[in-house]
Amino acid sequence: AGVDPLVPLRQAMFNYFQVPDRLGILTHLYRIAEGAQQGDPLSRSWELLKEGFLLALTQGR
């Protein structure tokens, strides 16, 4: 089996959210989902969230 290509992606997300693992990121994701369910436009808008995710992916370069 080869190297998992998602390892760098996962690590970038963990670093961005300052969490040690997948379980740590759940708190952030639950908060976003809860806001979206309550109609919060920021939580519902991928366009507004995308910049932060892209930054997290490119910080390690």
Curated annotation (Swiss-Prot):
It is an enzyme of class 2 (transferase). GO terms for biological process: defense response to bacterium; innate immune response; N-acetylneuraminate catabolic process; positive regulation of nucleotide-binding oligomerization domain containing 2 signaling pathway; response to muramyl dipeptide. Its EC number is 2.7.1.59, 2.7.1.-, 2.7.1.60. GO terms for molecular function: ATP binding; muramyl dipeptide kinase activity; N-acetylglucosamine kinase activity. Pathway: Amino-sugar metabolism; N-acetylneuraminate degradation. ATP binds at residue 45. Keywords: ATP-binding, Immunity, Innate immunity, Kinase, Nucleotide-binding, Phosphoprotein, Transferase. It catalyses: N-acetyl-D-glucosamine + ATP = N-acetyl-D-glucosamine 6-phosphate + ADP + H(+); aldehydo-N-acetyl-D-mannosamine + ATP = aldehydo-N-acetyl-D-mannosamine 6-phosphate + ADP + H(+); N-acetyl-D-muramoyl-L-alanyl-D-isoglutamine + ATP = 6-O-phospho-N-acetyl-D-muramoyl-L-alanyl-D-isoglutamine + ADP + H(+). The modification Phosphotyrosine is found at residue 30. Converts endogenous N-acetylglucosamine (GlcNAc), a major component of complex carbohydrates, from lysosomal degradation or nutritional sources into GlcNAc 6-phosphate. Also has N-acetylmannosamine (ManNAc) kinase activity. Involved in the N-glycolylneuraminic acid (Neu5Gc) degradation pathway. Also involved in innate immunity by promoting detection of bacterial peptidoglycan by NOD2: acts by catalyzing phosphorylation of muramyl dipeptide (MDP), a fragment of bacterial peptidoglycan, to generate 6-O-phospho-muramyl dipeptide, which acts as a direct ligand for NOD2. Homodimer. Belongs to the eukaryotic-type N-acetylglucosamine kinase family. This is N-acetyl-D-glucosamine kinase. It comes from Mesocricetus auratus. The gene is NAGK.
